[in-house]
A protein has these predicted regions:
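Single conserved hydrophobic/aromatic residue that forms the stacking wall/gate
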Residues: 2-9, 13
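Conserved hydrophobic positions within beta-strands
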Residues: 10, 56, 104, 128-129
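A structural micro-motif recognizing beta-strand termini
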Residues: 16, 22-28, 41-42, 58-60, ...
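Short, solvent-exposed secondary-structure boundary/capping segments
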Residues: 18-24, 47, 63-70, 116-118, ...
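Short aromatic-glycine motifs in intrinsically disordered, low-complexity regions
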Residues: 41-49, 117, 182-183
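P-loop NTPase nucleotide-binding/switch module
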Residues: 67-103, 107-110, 116-122, 139-199, ...
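P-loop NTPase catalytic core
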Residues: 191-192, 198-521
Length: 525
């Protein structure tokens, strides 16, 4: 609904008798008793169609590039797409075909990506194509097909459709367990704790440990067709950095501008709390839309903590019973439902698509026991724990190799995929280096207590083998042109070399010899 006086967008989230509880997506300053409101008859919706790539939106899908001034003015909205642009349409179906919601009618070329024009997701049941436009140039508002439903009623279809952000798009045949490795070029992810196409992961860590840099590295380098960045409640300077940096970046896979396959949805921390909550749902809905085209979509949300804070704010204002740290009692269900929208799907026509979701969590004071981290840990299959101690020692990315994990390593489907595409011994080697890292940490603590001379030389060898793994495989320079992205073949080569060195027997007389030898070895890499 919206106020008639200022056209402010808002949504009814609860009603009791004659009273409606309304979530306002903008500042409520100046609102007064007696203001008239008008219901529009639908939930908060996004407009889906060709022309979304390369755009910068806010949480309500306003095109920020069309807005003037430094700040967003209340009640000012812009249409998210270009009404006048002509698109080269090619039909993929024919007159007489039976179709359902989500089926492909045709395609247009959007930034060198085939953008499928689909039967609107809101259509229920089976339809017959009565007429379909021939190949040619059309605007998004022109009728490109007329469908007949089971009752004989004709329905017109254009290139655009609308969908409520709080509902998942489920126009697919099945949603199996994901198993294909998503290559990111980041060694501590691909080698040690891999994520898959259609997988979920989260990156918790205190401020200053490199969450945003790691997210940017993944979004630049991941083998995804579409990248969506949801800056939810970020500081304004970080959002500006995204806006200025991404248009300049080159996609390492295609050599074209990275922005051509990217959508940015920005909600800074000084924007209204309710809009912050809407931004992650808007991003996920757009991601599901592109998944329905058979594309691999990567969605990065920074940070889901601020989204949860928005949920807490609204829960408090609704006077609901508070849970731990005043978060809503149903926080775990809200987080689980949102993460469940990601996934790998088989479409009705046999094609596959995926939404891979990686969110960051900013726990207050780096406390990983707080409710948002705990509830996210239950549903996300990958956990990349950023550690202040590693960041202070400049060991970036500061992902703790012992606390972090990937549940996908336990999936038989993933193990079979890795054995066929990389090596049958890959997972065994990964588990071995994790064990060596844990043993190295235990010995490091003993050396700190007893001193270098207080432990046997063999212990120093075990410790320095774990340091070799740390320096060679785990640490990576995100700002170096070569080291920033490591292809999978090179990761396999490095892992095999390091494991071979770890298996070798060494004879040293003093701990100083051990240190000198392994330092030289690390420098060679």
């Amino acid at each position: 609904l919206h106020l008639l006086s200022r056209r402010q967008r808002q949504m009814c989230i609860r009603d009791r008798g004659k009273n409606a509880f309304v979530q306002v997506f903008e500042s409520t300053r100046g609102m007064r008793v007696g203001d008239e409101a008008e219901f529009e008859g639908h939930m908060l919706e996004v407009t889906l169609g060709p022309g979304m790539l390369s755009r910068n939106y806010d949480g309500l899908q306003n095109d920020l590039d069309k807005m003037e001034g430094v700040f967003l003015r209340r009640g000012e909205y812009t249409f998210p797409l270009d009404n006048d642009k002509l698109w080269d349409f090619k039909p993929l179906a024919k007159v007489g075909d039976k179709v359902a919601g989500g089926d492909w009618l045709g395609e247009v070329d959007e930034n060198f990506q085939p953008h499928k024009i689909m039967v609107p997701f809101t259509f229920k049941g089976e339809y017959t194509i009565k007429s379909l436009k021939e190949a040619g140039q059309y605007t998004i508002g022109e009728v490109i097909a007329v469908l007949t439903d089971e009752t004989g009623k004709d329905v017109e279809v254009t290139m655009i459709q609308r969908w409520p952000v709080k509902r998942a798009i489920t126009c697919y045949k099945e949603k199996p367990r994901p198993y294909k490795l998503l290559e990111t070029g980041v060694r501590t992810i691909d080698t040690v704790n891999p994520i898959v196409e259609g997988g979920t992961g989260f990156i918790p860590g205190p401020f200053g440990t490199g969450k945003t840099v790691l997210q940017h590295a993944i979004s630049k380098q991941a083998e995804a067709d579409i990248v969506i960045i949801a800056a939810c409640g970020e500081r304004a300077n970080e959002v500006v950095e995204i806006f200025t940096e991404f248009p300049e970046l080159v996609d390492p896979h295609t050599g074209r501008k990275l922005m051509e396959r990217t959508i940015i949805i920005a909600n800074t921390s000084n924007m209204p709390v309710a809009a912050r909550e809407a931004s992650v749902y808007t991003a996920m809905t757009i991601a599901e839309y592109y998944r329905s085209m058979g594309l691999k979509v990567l969605l990065m949300a920074d940070s889901t903590s601020r989204w949860a804070q928005a949920l807490r704010e609204m829960s408090n204002r609704l006077e609901e019973l508070p849970g731990p740290d005043a978060f809503p009692m149903d926080l775990s269900a809200i987080v689980a439902n949102f993460y469940a929208r990601a996934g790998y799907v088989h479409l009705n026509n046999g094609e596959t698509g995926s939404v891979t979701f990686i969110g960051t969590v900013s726990p207050a004071g780096g406390n990983l026991k707080e409710p948002v981290t705990e509830n996210t840990k239950k549903v996300a299959r990958c956990f990349y724990a950023l550690e202040q101690e590693r960041a202070d020692r400049k060991r970036y990315p500061a992902v703790n190799p012992i606390d972090s994990y990937s549940k996908y390593l336990e999936y038989p489907e993933f193990q079979e995929y890795i054995a066929g595409h990389i090596s049958p011994t890959w997972i065994d080697k990964v588990n071995e280096i994790k064990t060596r890292m844990l043993r190295g940490k235990e010995i490091s603590e003993q050396i700190n207590i007893l001193g270098d001379d207080g432990v046997p030389v063999e212990y120093h060898v075990i410790f320095w083998k774990s340091e070799l793994i740390d320096f060679v495989i785990l640490q990576q320079d995100a700002f170096d042109a070569i080291d920033a992205v490591t292809p999978l073949a090179r990761q396999e080569f490095m892992l095999n070399k390091v494991v071979k060195i770890c298996h070798a027997e060494f004879k040293f007389n003093t701990f100083l010899e051990v240190m000198e030898y392994f330092k030289k070895m690390i420098n060679i890499f």
